[in-house]
Amino acid sequence: GRTLRQASFKQDTKLERTSLLALQNATDLVKILKWNMDNNVKVFRIGSNIFPWNSEYEVTQLPDYSTIAEYLHLAGQIIKQSGQRVSFHPDHFVKLASSKPDVVRRSLHDLNHHNWIFDMMNLPATYHYPLNIHVGMNYSNDITEKFCEQFNNLNHSTKCRLVVENDDKANAYSVKKLYKNIYSKIGTPITFDYFHHTFNDDGLTSKEAAYLAAETWHEYKPLFHYSESKNLNENVSGNPRAHSDYALLTLDDYGLNIDVDLETKAKELAWTLYERNRHDKMVS
């Protein structure tokens, strides 16, 4: 989504430019959802920056608020009419278990803000429209306790949408650790990220982790993440955890009935290639 630098935001004392950017982001979202409908895209992650610097003002203060609200309502109608499953994945700075009170405050605000957008779209407050985050910190009993404590400070409908994803660092939260320490305490479903699991399997095969994560969704269809290594696909050196522009393979769903969010830099081009490869694999 469109945004503006902090210095520019501070100069926008009447929120006119900020409001215009939010309106453009809302209209762009409607266009994208219509494109998805025309091209049979059924799973889509909505960008997190519809409202730039939203922690610094009340959204209802924006000069274009009523028009923005109409576009969000229209977006929700398109989503339901076309059967799209949409999600949010707020930024990495969201850390409910942080020891810094300001980080926790901003994290709670950010999650409730994303949830409010879903509410504005009139989408049910369920895991069908998930709000996906990481614990985002190294595993410890103290971090687990803080995360669960702050979870209870979220708005009720935010809690009804929140899901947690396995991390890609060996000392962080694997699927197994999320199951034993987060899901077992607060019932939050686990988003299985195939790529992250390759860096932090915690003794589970990919199939075992996928089944363990799927179990936590109960009556809801699990939404998993799939991506591939930029180093391998594009023959470059660098961070092995960096995502490739395209997914050249197709995931193994291990017989599970799941939805998949494709995490690739090339967006709709990557999706088109992935679907073509998936179709070719099915008919071969």
Language-model features: locations:
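Short glycine-centered, acidic/aromatic-flanked micro-motifs in structured strand/loop junctions
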Residues: 90, 133-135, 164-166, 262
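Short acidic, Gly/Ser-rich segments with clustered Asp/Glu that frequently serve as metal-coordination loops
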Residues: 170, 195-201
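Long, compositionally biased, intrinsically disordered segments
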Residues: 188-191, 199
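Short, internal active-site loops enriched in acidic
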Residues: 50-52, 92-94, 135-140, 169
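Alpha/beta catalytic barrel-like cores
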Residues: 1-85, 94-108, 112-123, 127, ...
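Conserved, mostly hydrophobic/aromatic
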Residues: 89, 193, 260
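A general structural motif
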Residues: 142-147, 206
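Glycine-rich phosphate-binding "P-loop"
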Residues: 129-143, 234-240
